[in-house]
Design a protein with these regions (language model features):
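N-terminal Rossmann-like FAD-binding beta1-loop-alpha1 element of flavoenzymes
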Residues: 44-70
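Glycine-rich FAD pyrophosphate-binding loop
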Residues: 64-82
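Short hydrophobic core segments
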Residues: 49, 179-190
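N-terminal glycine-rich dinucleotide-binding loop that anchors FAD/FMN and/or NAD(P) in oxidoreductases
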Residues: 84-107
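Extreme N-terminal leader/targeting segments of oxidoreductases
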Residues: 1-45, 162
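Flavin (primarily FAD) binding-site architecture
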Residues: 187-202
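Single conserved hydrophobic/aromatic residue that forms the stacking wall/gate
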Residues: 239-242, 246-247
């Protein structure tokens, strides 16, 4: 009876689908790939803080130009607020001529007004993430910006730590950060402006505060004022109109 049951089980077992791989091989592969990326991008041409739409778009464009680009993101996922258009609703909009970026990435959209275009946020952000990866951009997610590396009056890199460290009590998380260096840092962290605020704390940049919402005026500022706010540090996104240099 026992032999018959065993034969029945064997007969019902389907053909093998997946290749053989030991658990330790998987662990080594993950650890090695992470180490290789960190070793290669610890010194990059450009480091971008924030993997929202601004950071992802900039990283793709710069990588296609031949620069070695690293993006850090404090969340486990990439895309920032691009997943949602507002008030927890996921359609997102752009005004002409910004839809040309959607054309370039193959993102479908529809016209909903005079010069106003709409697409599902998940579709747009997934295409943009894929395009950045295809261009050669590397990412460190769950990585939190802590401070700037400064040399001779110029931003030369950033100081980072694991994001979960900041969520634990300090008395049990004596975990030192590490430094990453680059020729240029781009702060694409959104309204937090984490890198710029480190300069404000040291009175190297003046901060006039955030203006009330005005889409047309704010988006024009993004285009016209994106640039260096301090040697080695470029600021992007809507907060570009907020800081000024005192020198």
């Amino acid at each position: 009876m026992k032999k018959f049951m065993q034969e029945s089980v064997n007969e019902q077992r389907p053909d093998k689908i997946f290749a053989d791989a030991k658990e330790v091989e998987i662990t080594r592969a993950i650890a090695k790939e992470f180490y290789d990326v960190l070793q290669d991008r610890a010194e990059s041409d450009i480091i971008i803080i924030g993997a929202g739409p601004a950071g992802l778009t900039a990283s793709r464009e710069l990588s296609l130009m031949g620069y070695k680009v690293l993006v850090i993101e404090q969340n486990n996922y990439l895309g920032g607020g691009y997943w949602l258009g507002g008030y927890m609703m996921n359609p997102v909009t752009v005004r002409a001529p910004a839809q040309k970026i959607w054309d370039e990435l193959g993102i479908p959209y529809k016209k909903v007004g005079d010069g106003l275009y709409l697409t599902p946020g998940p579709h747009a952000v997934s295409k943009l993430i894929g395009a950045a990866c295809d261009a050669g951009v590397k990412f460190l997610n769950l990585t939190k910006f802590d401070d700037l590396v400064m040399r001779h009056g110029r931003v030369a890199g950033i100081v980072v730590n694991w994001m979960p460290v900041s969520a634990l009590p300090r008395n049990i998380t004596c975990v030192d950060p590490v430094a990453l260096e680059a020729k240029l840092i781009i702060d694409a962290s959104g309204h937090d402006s984490v890198a710029v605020k480190r300069l404000v704390d040291r009175q190297l940049v003046e901060w006039k505060g955030m203006n009330p919402m005005w889409v047309e005026d704010g988006e024009e500022h993004v285009v016209h004022k994106t640039g260096e706010v301090y040697p080695g540090l470029v600021l992007s996104l809507i907060h570009i109109s907020e800081p000024t240099r005192p020198y």
